[in-house]
Each structure stands twice: as structure tokens, then as C-alpha cells.
Regions:
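Short, well-formed alpha-helical segments that are part of the catalytic scaffolds
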Residues: 16-30, 53
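Short aromatic/hydrophobic "clamp" motif used to bind/position activated sugar donors
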Residues: 90
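Membrane-interface aromatic/basic loop that binds lipid-linked glycans or pyrophosphate carriers
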Residues: 273-332
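Glycine-rich, basic loop-to-helix element that forms the pyrophosphate-binding segment
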Residues: 69-85, 95
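Cell-envelope/extracellular polymer assembly enzymes that use nucleotide-activated donors
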Residues: 5-8, 26, 38, 192
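Catalytic core of nucleotide-sugar-dependent glycosyltransferases
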Residues: 209-217, 223-249, 264, 272-290
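A conserved acidic beta->alpha catalytic loop
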Residues: 43-52, 70
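Donor-binding/catalytic cores of nucleotide-activated saccharide
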Residues: 74, 95-205, 215-225
């Protein structure tokens, strides 16, 4: 077994028998030799045939390592992969997604030659009809492509950008040095993780190459509404407010994120019960949030218009609209 690699690809896996082979094959079809990178698959208690599919493929490649654990969720599986990784840089890849052919050398060279803590790259969204859509934040990153910035400067310049973990490469020593692990048991782990680790980084860069394909399934976990989802939303909102104070130079970026999460919370809570709604409204009151200003999308502008009159008015109005006009259910 090799002591160190250039890259570690960490793939958490749970019940993805329909997609894991595509994901693994994309990681194999690369332009680094097998002794230069490793693929770590974390079987997070899968109950389908995912594990047998991976084990069959792993028999053919010495750089594929499989670790099984009791189901602990996405963050737990990512942390397990991180703890076992030996690469200079780590790429966290979701098991129903796939990466572009022959991108590993490009990513490693960009990260290592610029001595980066974090590298961000472009990605596609692919729906179940195999329609591809470019990441909408590409235009935002264009002015800073191939420019090495501090984490603070980078964060200030990417207002409107989705902080999607698989679209970043992370230097392992940077994560270890600061004990940057994923928060377990929450839904919005990508935002929580990246808003914690990007601002304090010394060297961050974006490159324009499309390296990743995000598969958007209709039954995505982020589309399910439950009280736990609202509790997680309240948790991440509180964290973002704290980080706006800690990283005050990035106030505009955190304001945009906070306002977006408030709008999302109002939309979700409009379908929830009174206890769920009270929980979310109390979080807003506790943090003295009364107005929404920094939103861009039409759905958020409509939501903010109602919210700025009164949060309860926003909840009741959106609930009425979504139930009275079914087509709005998919637009708000």
C-alpha cells in the first residue's frame, strides 16, 4: 500500500446501486496513474447492491479502497474518508454524480503549483432527462479565474455563488491543521463547512474548467420538508449570523446567504405546522432579523416582499398561494 498520493477522491455511498458504477468509472478514466491517486469509497450502511458493485470493481484496481461503517449520514462518511485519506489534496465526490474525463492532472497541477489551500472549479447540473445546465455562478467567478486570493478576498468577490463541496479541492494538511471536519447530523453541511473553512484560508483560486457533473434527482434530500429540516435550517442560519460577525470583511456575502436561507425557510415553513413555524420565527427574532434585502431570484424577491411586511404575513400568504395555485408550488 502506497504511503502518500497526489489526490484522494472520497466517495460517501448509501443505496446508490443505480449510480455508483458510473461514478467510479469516471474516477478511473483519468490522466494520473493509479499510484498517484486513491479512490476511497465509504459504504455508509448501504442496504442495496451498492457495496457488491464497488467490491467487484475494486478487485481490478489497487488504488480503490472500500471502508464500511454503520450508517451515520453524509458528513460522517466524509469525515471517515478524510481521516483515512493520504493524498496531498482531497476531493469529496457524491456517489450519484460523476467527474469529467482526464481532469485530475489539471486539478492537481493548478493546486500544487500555486500552493493552494482550496481550489474551486466549474461544474454542470444534469437532470434525470440527461439535460445539462452550466453552473449559474460562472459569470461571477470569471473576473477572478486563475487569480490566487486570500480566503477573505475570495469570499468578498463570489457573492451569489453556491458553496457546493464537490466543486472544491482541499489541501489535506490545511484541513488537518485546523481540525476542519464536517458537522454531523445536519442538512446544509456544504454551506456550514465552506463558510467555516474558506475565509481563514491563505490561498484560494478558481479555474474555469468544468470538472464535475451534479446529478439532480427529483427525490433529492434537500427537497423533503420535515421539522428536522427546519431545525437544521435554523442552526445554519444562526451559524451564518455568527460568521458574519467573525468575518466582518465578508459582510455582504454573509448577508446574501442569510437572506437566501430566510426566504428558503419561509417557503419551507409555509408547508409546516405551527410549532415548526414558531421555531423558525423565534430564531429570526432572537437574531433581530426584520428585513430581507440582498436577494436576486424572483422567488426570493416575492418572498422578501411579503416578509418585509411581516414574517407571519409571508408564511400565510405563501401557504395560500401554493395551495390555491398548484403551479406556484414549483416556483416558490
Amino acid at each position: 500500500m502506497i504511503d502518500s498520493y497526489k489526490l484522494s477522491l472520497v466517495i460517501p455511498m448509501y443505496n446508490v446501486e443505480l449510480y455508483i458504477e458510473r461514478c467510479l468509472n469516471s474516477c478511473i478514466n483519468q490522466n494520473l496513474s493509479p499510484n498517484e491517486y486513491e479512490i476511497i469509497v465509504i459504504n455508509d450502511g448501504s442496504k442495496d447492491n451498492s457495496l457488491s458493485i464497488v467490491e467487484k470493481i475494486a478487485q481490478k484496481y489497487t488504488n480503490i479502497h472500500v471502508i464500511s461503517q454503520i450508517n451515520g449520514g453524509l458528513s460522517s462518511a466524509r469525515n471517515t474518508g478524510f481521516k483515512n485519506a493520504r493524498g496531498q489534496y482531497i476531493w469529496f465526490i457524491d456517489s450519484d454524480d460523476w467527474i469529467e474525463p482526464n481532469v485530475l492532472k489539471t486539478l492537481y497541477d493548478a493546486a500544487s503549483q500555486n500552493d493552494l489551500d482550496i481550489l474551486r472549479f466549474a461544474w454542470n447540473i444534469v437532470d434525470e432527462k440527461n439535460q445539462k445546465y452550466s453552473d449559474s455562478s460562472d459569470a461571477i467567478h470569471m473576473p477572478i479565474y486563475n487569480k490566487c486570493l486570500s480566503g477573505i478576498e475570495y469570499t468578498k468577490k463570489v457573492l451569489g455563488t453556491v458553496l457546493y463541496v464537490p466543486s472544491f479541492l482541499y489541501r489535506r494538511e490545511y484541513l488537518l491543521e485546523h481540525s476542519f471536519f464536517f458537522k454531523q447530523g445536519i442538512t446544509y453541511e456544504d454551506v456550514e463547512f465552506n463558510t467555516r473553512i474558506i475565509p481563514p484560508a491563505s490561498r484560494v483560486m478558481s479555474i474555469p474548467q468544468i470538472c464535475y457533473n451534479y446529478f439532480q434527482r427529483n427525490n433529492s434530500i434537500t427537497k423533503h420538508i420535515s421539522q428536522k429540516t427546519i431545525e437544521n435550517l435554523s442552526f445554519i442560519l444562526t451559524k451564518l449570523i455568527e460568521r458574519k460577525r467573525t468575518f466582518s470583511e465578508c459582510k455582504n456575502y454573509f448577508d446574501w446567504l442569510i437572506d437566501g436561507f430566510i426566504c428558503w425557510g419561509i417557503i419551507l415553513c409555509s408547508e409546516g405546522n405551527i410549532e415548526t413555524q414558531k421555531l423558525f420565527i423565534n430564531v429570526l427574532k432572537k437574531n433581530n432579523i426584520r428585513k430581507i434585502r440582498k436577494v436576486k431570484s424572483l422567488k426570493n424577491k416575492v418572498t422578501s416582499l411579503f416578509f418585509n411586511i411581516n414574517p407571519w404575513f409571508a408564511l400565510l400568504t405563501i401557504k395560500y398561494l401554493r395551495r390555491s395555485y398548484k403551479f406556484i408550488k414549483y416556483k416558490l
